[in-house]
Each structure stands twice: as C-alpha cells, then as structure tokens.
C-alpha cells in the first residue's frame, strides 16, 4: 500500500513539473550552432519603443558557409544580405549601400556564448519552461543581471533547430523595452540561392566600414572607468565626406556599448548629457573640440560612466 501511495505522489509531482527540452548548457550550445546549420524562412516583428518593424528572413547554409537575407516589409525599404561575416545593407530610397564585416557575434540579437562561465559573473541564467511561438515548441531561458549596469533578457528557442524565435529585453524594473518575435517560421531542407542575390546598384553611393578588431588596435583612446566585465571587442574607422570618426565597441559577452569619437565641428552626434528612447540610452559630451557619444541597449548609468571616463592615450 505504501508503495502505491509513493508511486502516486511521485507521478503527481512529476506531472506538474515543466517538461524542459534539454538543460541550459545544451540549449545554449544549440543556440550558438544554429546559425551554421539551419535552413529556414520566416517573418519576425521587431518592436523598439513605439515603433514596429516587420522583416522577411531567409537563412541558408551550404558548402560556402552561411547566407542570410532580411528585407523590410514596412517603413523604409531596406535589404540586408550576409555571407558569413560580410554584410551588405541596401537602402533603395537613399540610393545607399554599405559593406561591413561582422565580428564573432552574428545576427540581430545578443546570442549567449557557449562558455557560460564568464557570463555567470554578471548574469544568472535559468530555464523557465516551454512555450509556443509561431506554432512551434520552444524552450524559454531567463537571463537576469547581477548589477545595475546591464539589462535582462528572455529567450524563446525553437526546440528542433534552437533558432531564436522570440527575445525580450527587460529594463531594471523587469519591464519589456524591446521585443523580437517570429510570426511565421518554416524549417527547410534547402533554401533558394536566388534569395541572396544582390540587385543592380547603378547610381548607388557605396560606403565601406573598415574594422580593426582586438584590444591591440592603435585607437588613441581608452575608458578609465568601465563597468565590470565590459571589454573592447571592436574598433572601426568610418570615413565621411568631411569627417572621420572612430567607433569603439565594448561588450560583456552579451550586452554591447558603442563609443563614437569625432571632431566636434563636423560631428554627426551633437548630444550633450543623457538621452534615451526605449531600450536605447545615450550620453554625449564635448572634450577639447572632440565629440564623445556613448550609446547602447544598457541602462543610462552604463553609458554615462563610460562617456565620462574616456581619455586620449596619444
């Protein structure tokens, strides 16, 4: 009789526990690998502040690497084509095309690194359970910051492919300040190569974004007070018609912050003090004729701390 009662209680407890599809490490490992092994077609909606953007996505993998095409379905016309780490962005209305190289982190949204040890110093990561997005079963991960210098995240990852189907960015109060969500998603055996064709660009102006990666880049600037965990991951020199600007990117492995340094007279960023819209916060200051602007999807304290600590090294 005791055995029967124990078995019944065990079944009752287990039946009310969430049926997790893999542990956190397995899910994160699949998330990191999904970009290099998945073929799919889908549509997602990106909500930032009071604006919404809808994008059609085609993602493919072949013997030449990873291909991705994203095309806006509302607002300004835009098409982005990526082959491995090269990204071509086309803006038909402005007759503009930009070409850039991406770093290790690919895609629109922060991807959790496979090695969670370093990230665990700044975030608590746990699995919340399962949910359905775009008609597909997903596993939900919660990423909670341990200090006030970064936001929190929630990830909905497709159980079959581990592709990110939904992502919430959460502020200090736990409120959603930005959201990406697929409304349709179809896993494919192969996708048509024609989806990645570049249209005729006659009459378009072309802008090349040259990037030097790594802390050894001779950039002439540094931040003397950086929130714990943020490291220089990328430096970019952008050349305009009458101005040259330096773009530095710092990251803790998940959140990223951009620093723009340019001549004050020809600056495209003329911000003084704090500013913010939705998840994006910015802080600007002038220093000896140089405009320094720091921005990122992080709390205001983070961009202000970095901006006020920037100094020349040469």
Regions found by a protein language model. Give the residues of each.
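Short, solvent-exposed coil/turn segments at beta-strand boundaries
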Residues: 36-37, 59-67, 81-86, 136, ...
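An acidic-aromatic
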Residues: 56-110, 166-183, 187
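N-terminal leader/targeting segments and the immediate start of mature chains
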Residues: 2-66, 120, 130-132, 267-314
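Short, solvent-exposed recognition patches
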Residues: 203-287, 301
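Short, small/polar residue-rich loop motifs at catalytic or cofactor-binding pockets
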Residues: 74-76, 124, 149-151, 278-279
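Short, hydrophobic/aromatic-rich segments at coil-to-beta transitions
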Residues: 37-43, 63-69, 135-142, 163-166, ...
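Gly/Pro-enriched, hydrophobic low-complexity segments
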Residues: 130, 134-202
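Short N-terminal edge-element motif at the start of the domain
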Residues: 97-99, 104-149
């Amino acid at each position: 009789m005791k055995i029967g009662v124990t078995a019944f209680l065990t079944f009752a407890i287990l039946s009310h526990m969430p049926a997790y599809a893999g542990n956190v490490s397995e899910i994160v490992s699949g998330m990191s690998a999904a970009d290099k092994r998945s073929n799919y077609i889908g549509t997602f909606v990106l909500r930032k502040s009071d604006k919404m953007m809808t994008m059609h996505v085609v993602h493919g993998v072949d013997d030449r690497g990873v291909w991705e095409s994203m095309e806006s379905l509302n607002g300004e016309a835009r098409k982005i084509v990526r082959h491995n780490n090269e990204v071509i962005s086309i803006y038909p209305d402005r007759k503009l095309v930009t070409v850039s190289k991406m770093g290790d982190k690919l895609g629109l949204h922060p991807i959790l690194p496979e090695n969670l040890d370093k990230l665990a110093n700044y975030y608590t990561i746990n699995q919340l359970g399962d949910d359905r997005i775009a008609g597909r079963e997903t596993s939900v991960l919660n990423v909670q910051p341990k200090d006030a210098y970064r936001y929190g995240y929630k990830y909905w990852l497709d159980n079959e492919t581990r592709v990110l189907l939904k992502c919430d960015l959460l502020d200090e109060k736990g409120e959603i300040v930005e959201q990406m969500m697929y409304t349709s998603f179809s896993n494919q055996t192969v996708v048509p190569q024609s989806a990645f064709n570049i249209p005729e660009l006659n009459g378009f102006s072309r802008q090349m974004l040259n990037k030097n990666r790594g802390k050894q880049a001779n950039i002439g600037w540094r931040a003397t007070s950086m929130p714990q965990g943020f490291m220089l991951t990328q430096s970019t020199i952008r050349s305009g018609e009458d101005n040259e600007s330096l773009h530095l990117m710092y990251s803790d492995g998940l959140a990223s912050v951009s620093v723009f340094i340019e001549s004050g007279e020809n600056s495209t960023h003329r911000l003084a003090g704090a500013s913010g819209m939705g998840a994006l916060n910015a802080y600007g200051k002038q220093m000896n004729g140089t405009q320094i602007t720091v921005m990122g999807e992080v709390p205001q304290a983070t961009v202000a701390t970095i901006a006020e600590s920037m100094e020349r090294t040469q």
